[in-house]
Amino acid sequence: AGTLLTRVDLPDRGHDVTFSPTDGRGVVFARQPGTFAVVFDPAGQAAPVTLISTEGRHFFGHGAFSPDGRLLYATENDYDNARSVIGIFDVAGGFRRIGEFDAHGTGAHEMLLTADGSTLVVANGGIETHPDYGRAELNLATMDPNLVFLDARSGGLIGQLRLSADLYQLSIRHMAFDAQGRVWFGCQFRGAPQTQP
């Protein structure tokens, strides 16, 4: 059996955790449409710090550190404009939000950083949500999931891949890199059961 190293209380349900490659601190992100992220020390040597999303945004449950540990990237919802953004946080500045990149889609979920730190890969699930409606999915008839590749330094769009038109209700959610650096992704079907691919 394992030994409990530390325990971190969260304001509400969390979704995913990412760890700094330099100092080992973790950040757990709220499940969407949550507005918190909690920075914690897995060894329990420092008190947790709660971050609150900026006005007009909420977290989508995922994030990643830059390889040098200086930046934290987080998937966020610009909910009044139904668009995904990547929030950028300055770690040394107390995780102060210093900007955002357009993620070129709706309903971002997981985001990964390539091993060399040059590219952000974003799974835009294609589902519009708004905190005024809880977790209600507002556009199932017009979903547009896509996979986006962004320059991690500038936010510039490197590429965007879409599923074939008949698969528009497959919401791209989670991803992984294989040993060759290829991206594999999993989807959730959000259509009627009788039309499931």
PLM segments and residue spans:
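Beta-strand-rich domains and repeat architectures in extracellular enzymes and scaffolds
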Residues: 1-29
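A short beta-strand motif characteristic of beta-propeller blades
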Residues: 3-9, 46-53, 96-101, 156-165
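Repeated scaffold domains used in trafficking and secretory/extracellular systems
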Residues: 12-19, 57-64, 106-112, 168-174
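Residue-level detector of Asp-centered blade-edge/turn motifs that repeat once per structural unit
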Residues: 21-23, 66-68, 115-116, 178-180
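Hydrophobic beta-strand positions that form the internal "hydrophobic ladder"
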Residues: 26-27, 72, 120, 183
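Structural recognition of the beta-propeller blade-terminating site
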Residues: 30, 38-41, 76, 87-90, ...
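Short, conserved, GDST-rich strand-edge loop motifs in beta-rich repeat architectures
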Residues: 75-79, 122-143, 185-196
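Beta-propeller blade signature
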Residues: 85-93, 137-153, 196-197
